[in-house]
């Protein structure tokens, strides 16, 4: 029995369960990254190395974009609390 599909499957299952159960968005993004790592491992175990290279290059970029979007959301919420309902409008 090969070890790579087994470990990758466990990563996928743990990542999926973590995404469902966690309520903190940062933890959800981390668990989504764990799920993506498991998927890359399963792709490699099927010998689709070209697809694994592309997905391993795209996965960190997508994770960083998700983190930046969430941090932007947090700063917007904090500014709205600071200004109350009169959030300054920068454009019409």
From Swiss-Prot:
Q: Which domain of life is it from?
A: Archaea
Q: Which UniProt keywords apply?
A: Cell membrane, Membrane, Transmembrane, Transmembrane helix
Q: How does this protein sit in the membrane? A: Multi-pass membrane protein
**A single cellular component GO annotation:** plasma membrane
Q: Which compartments does it reside in?
A: Cell membrane
This protein is called Uncharacterized protein MJ0526
Q: Which residues cross the membrane?
A: 1-21, 29-49, 51-71
InterPro entries, per the entry: DUF2108_membrane, Prd_NiFe_hyd_3_EhaD
């Amino acid at each position: 029995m090969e070890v790579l599909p087994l470990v990758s499957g466990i990563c996928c299952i743990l990542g999926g369960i973590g995404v469902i159960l966690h309520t903190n968005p940062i933890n959800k993004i981390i668990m989504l990254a764990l799920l993506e790592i498991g998927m890359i491992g399963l792709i490699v175990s099927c010998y689709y190395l070209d697809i694994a290279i592309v997905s391993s290059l795209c996965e960190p970029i997508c994770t960083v974009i998700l983190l930046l979007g969430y941090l932007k959301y947090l700063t917007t919420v904090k500014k709205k609390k600071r200004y109350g309902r009169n959030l300054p409008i920068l454009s019409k």
